[in-house]
Amino acid sequence: MEMSAAMFARVSFYPTLLYNVLMEKASARNWYDRIDEHVILGALPFRSQANDLIEKENMKAVVSMNEDYELTAFSNNTEKWRKLGIEFLQLATTDIFESPNQEKLFRGVEFINKFLPLKQRIGGLSSSYQPENVGSVYVHCKAGRTRSATLVGCYLMMKNGWTPDQAVDHMRKCRPHILLHTKQWDALRLFYTNNVETKS
């Protein structure tokens, strides 16, 4: 099943990416949306969008939930982002059938935390503070709907002490077309139990 799921994700990548481009042009969907003052949730950032994101959105870092093959043709890899002065974290997760595992979700939240102002930092996370790094983090997968939304939901829960329902409701207000399936909901609930509920 894992092999066939990974193969299906690969085969469907370009057609579904084209669908996302068309939906952004033909509907009210945005390529990306700001979730709070520090986190942007979006689709695959094309190389042509990089400078705009840096200049207009004060983007300092990128978290990609994509696998390597999804980044090759249109988006920057670690080296290309670093040349632009952007920190990059890749938490590769297979599209459609998988949710990011708990270790990846925690690493992602910890990474985002590095770019928050000191007074807004999530307590208990081991991330160094450098004032020059304060800015926005662009969190993405292919469409900015499922894998990346799962990570952003975890960030919102830890930052605000929210439940999974509260985090998802907030994301839907900002980005109505997010799409979470049972596996993503299960991941959010487990993350909440392990990292939020036990600390409140």
Curated annotation (Swiss-Prot):
- Which molecular function terms from Gene Ontology are attached? phosphatidylglycerophosphatase activity; phosphatidylinositol-4,5-bisphosphate 5-phosphatase activity; protein serine/threonine phosphatase activity; protein tyrosine phosphatase activity
Domain (Tyrosine-protein phosphatase): residue spans on this chain: 31-197
Protein's job: Lipid phosphatase that may mediate dephosphorylation of mitochondrial proteins. Protein phosphatase that may mediate dephosphorylation of mitochondrial proteins. Does not dephosphorylate Akt.
Name of the top EC class for this enzyme: hydrolase
Q: Which reaction does it catalyse?
A: a 1,2-diacyl-sn-glycero-3-phospho-(1'-sn-glycero-3'-phosphate) + H2O = a 1,2-diacyl-sn-glycero-3-phospho-(1'-sn-glycerol) + phosphate; O-phospho-L-tyrosyl-[protein] + H2O = L-tyrosyl-[protein] + phosphate; O-phospho-L-seryl-[protein] + H2O = L-seryl-[protein] + phosphate; O-phospho-L-threonyl-[protein] + H2O = L-threonyl-[protein] + phosphate
Report the sequence similarity comment from the record: Belongs to the protein-tyrosine phosphatase family. Non-receptor class dual specificity subfamily.
Checking CDD domains in the record gives: PTPMT1 (cd14524)
**Annotated InterPro entries:** Dual-sp_phosphatase_cat-dom (IPR000340), Prot-tyrosine_phosphatase-like (IPR029021), PTPMT1 (IPR042165), PTPMT1-like (IPR044596), Tyr_Pase_AS (IPR016130), Tyr_Pase_dom (IPR000387), TYR_PHOSPHATASE_DUAL_dom (IPR020422)
Q: One biological-process term from Gene Ontology? A: cardiolipin biosynthetic process
- UniProt subcellular location: Mitochondrion inner membrane
Main subcellular location: mitochondrion
Question: What tissues harbor this protein?
Answer: Highly enriched in testis.
Entry's PANTHER family? Answer: PHOSPHATIDYLGLYCEROPHOSPHATASE AND PROTEIN-TYROSINE PHOSPHATASE 1 (PTHR46712:SF1)
| Bilayer topology term | Peripheral membrane protein
Q: Which organism is it from?
A: Drosophila melanogaster
| Cited Gene3D superfamilies | Protein tyrosine phosphatase superfamily (3.90.190.10)
One GO cellular component this record assigns the protein to is: mitochondrial inner membrane
Record SUPFAM superfamilies: (Phosphotyrosine protein) phosphatases II
Q: Which UniProt keywords apply?
A: Hydrolase, Lipid biosynthesis, Lipid metabolism, Membrane, Mitochondrion, Mitochondrion inner membrane, Phospholipid biosynthesis, Phospholipid metabolism, Protein phosphatase, Transit peptide
* Pfam families, A to Z: DSPc (PF00782)
> Which protein, by its recorded name, is this?
Phosphatidylglycerophosphatase and protein-tyrosine phosphatase 1
The record places the transit peptide at 1-28
Pathway membership: Phospholipid metabolism; phosphatidylglycerol biosynthesis; phosphatidylglycerol from CDP-diacylglycerol: step 2/2
- Name the Enzyme Commission number(s) assigned to this protein: 3.1.3.27, 3.1.3.16, 3.1.3.48
Which residues act catalytically here? 141 (phosphocysteine intermediate)
